[in-house]
């Protein structure tokens, strides 16, 4: 068995940039306030937002901790409940990045895979997370108790973690559903759930994306876009270049 690491933020931006390159439009800071089928069902959806109403042939519900809200608007007869599960992390400086050379997991439990210790693609050391159910779906602040738990449990698998080299701590929320499974499928004509995606959601993301695309393709009788461009030009990191390559960049863009 093999494993690998990736920057989740960089991956997300890369996918979003490629989507925009292929015609996707993003509407940021736009909250869905309601939705209902058009023309009595089967012909699409009206999505009411705080910036007006949108009409669409299909909705893919990938709303994270709020996926239950959208699901229940579309299918109140089969309600879903998403619980926000907070995970606290420590991020350590590059000087601690070689403390471990691969991801060290603990035995998984009822709340997930436990506290891990892993290097990052940027050379830092990442320690966490906890798994604490919270009522507030915006509760991304760390707590003293949560960070104490990370300190204690990480030491069970890796000794002498240099936590004094912590440069920041942070927390994120997982979208937990009581049945402990991903919910992916068309629950109403033109409404596709992609909900309750916990670990290993990141590793599964390419396969989930392909699966959802197949569902939408079948529902709307779509064909592949002939001019789709699968490439994305990465963001150059000057620190990774030698002096000659940096000098060439400066020559090309002296301003």
Show which residues each predicted segment covers.
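Flavin-dependent oxidoreductases
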Residues: 35-128, 132-143, 152, 158-161, ...
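Hydrophobic (often cysteine-bearing) scaffold residues that line and stabilize catalytic clefts
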Residues: 8, 69, 205
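General beta-strand structural signal in soluble alpha/beta enzymes
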Residues: 26-28, 61, 127, 166-168, ...
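Active-site catalytic microenvironments for nucleophilic, acid-base chemistry
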Residues: 18-22, 69, 73, 211, ...
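Helical element adjacent to the flavin cofactor pocket in flavoenzyme catalytic cores
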Residues: 2-38, 42-58
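C-terminal catalytic lobe of FAD-dependent flavoproteins
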Residues: 14, 112, 121-122, 133-255
């Amino acid at each position: 068995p093999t494993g690998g690491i990736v920057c989740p933020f960089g991956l997300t931006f890369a996918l979003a940039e490629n989507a925009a390159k292929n015609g996707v439009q993003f509407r940021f800071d736009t909250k869905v306030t309601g939705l209902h089928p058009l023309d009595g069902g089967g012909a699409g959806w009206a999505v009411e937002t705080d910036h007006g109403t949108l009409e669409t042939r299909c909705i893919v519900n990938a709303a994270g901790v709020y996926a239950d809200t959208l699901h229940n608007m579309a299918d109140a007869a089969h309600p879903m409940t998403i619980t926000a599960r907070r995970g606290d992390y420590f991020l350590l400086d590059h000087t601690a990045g070689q403390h471990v050379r691969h991801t060290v997991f603990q035995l998984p439990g009822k709340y997930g895979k436990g506290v891990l210790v892993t290097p990052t693609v940027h050379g830092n050391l990442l320690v966490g997370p906890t798994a604490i159910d919270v009522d507030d779906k915006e509760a991304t602040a760390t707590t003293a108790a949560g960070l104490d738990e990370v300190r204690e449990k990480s030491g069970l698998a890796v000794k002498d973690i240099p936590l004094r080299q912590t440069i920041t701590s942070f927390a994120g929320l997982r979208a937990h559903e009581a049945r402990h499974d991903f919910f992916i499928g068309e629950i109403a004509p033109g409404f596709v759930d992609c909900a309750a995606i916990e670990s290993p959601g990141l590793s599964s993301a390419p396969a989930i994306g392909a699966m959802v695309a197949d569902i939408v393709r079948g529902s709307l009788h779509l064909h592949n876009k002939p001019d789709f461009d699968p490439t994305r030009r990465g963001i150059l990191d000057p620190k990774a270049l030698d002096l000659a390559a940096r000098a060439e960049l400066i020559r090309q863009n002296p301003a």
